[in-house]
Amino acid sequence: DFWVGPFYVGFFGVTAAFFIMLGTALIIWGAALGPTWNIWQISIAPPDLSYGLGLAPLAKGGLWQIITVCAIGAFGSWALREVEISRKLGIGLHVPAAFSVAIFAYVTLEVIRPLLMGAWGNGFPYGIMSHLDWVSNTGYAYLNFEYNPMHMVAVTLFFTTTLALALHGSLVLAAINPPAGETVKFAEHEDTFFRDFIGYSIGTLGIHRLGLFLALGAGFASATCILLSGPFWTQGWPSWWGWWLHLPIWQFGGH
């Protein structure tokens, strides 16, 4: 039951700190081995595809492998620390469960997908510009990644999450900051506003549940969209939609 001032640490807080410090030190080491100290250009690359699923020398991808283990250890420790805090507070495990979806997305990118494709080199590098290049190159490898159906679902859910919670947040700000001479508004006014605005109000508790559902759905769909690309679909994503062109409705009344 270890605390630092008002902050609960616990066993998993200690393990999280260990993995964070070790991983950070290895990143600095990798940067020292590289050609630049420019924060934008520093990159810790995964092993070459020729190494497959084997261990690589430290300077040729081995650092990336150890840093990945440290990252998973840090994320997992932090989630378990959240579990301990939730139990101490007597609340549900919604926060660690939500964080676990983000961990799943990371593990999908760096562990599950490379495993299914047979090489750690299919993971993304650790670096600002290098990881953006990886995203761009991976997208072009499938011609137009926006045609990936799960990518469509993920983007839709991300934007819908933003819209739903922006509507809620802006309404709360409007309700608790009335013009001079007016009283502060409460939940019944908020419900009435949305019933008048869109015909339905999900309620003050419901909007937070909806926001959580949309956000976690976005994270899960984003992990799924990259998992499909490579292990299960190797062509360009536009060609996946060929079935759409052969629906009977397009042949109706034709020759």
Curated annotation (Swiss-Prot):
Q: What does this protein do?
A: The reaction center is a membrane-bound complex that mediates the initial photochemical event in the electron transfer process of photosynthesis.
Q: One GO term of the cellular component aspect?
A: plasma membrane
Species in which this protein is naturally found = Acidiphilium multivorum
Q: Which SUPFAM superfamilies match?
A: Bacterial photosystem II reaction centre, L and M subunits (SSF81483)
Q: Which GO terms of the molecular function aspect are on file?
A: bacteriochlorophyll binding; electron transporter, transferring electrons within the cyclic electron transport pathway of photosynthesis activity; metal ion binding
Please name the taxonomic classification of the source. Bacteria, Pseudomonadati, Pseudomonadota, Alphaproteobacteria, Acetobacterales
Q: According to its UniProt record, where is this protein mainly located?
A: membrane
Record note on quaternary structure: Reaction center is composed of four bacteriochlorophylls, two bacteriopheophytins, two ubiquinones, one iron, and two highly hydrophobic polypeptide chains (designated L and M).
Keywords carried by this UniProt record: Bacteriochlorophyll, Cell inner membrane, Cell membrane, Chlorophyll, Chromophore, Electron transport, Iron, Magnesium, Membrane, Metal-binding, Photosynthesis, Reaction center, Transmembrane, Transmembrane helix, Transport
Q: What is this protein called?
A: Reaction center protein L chain
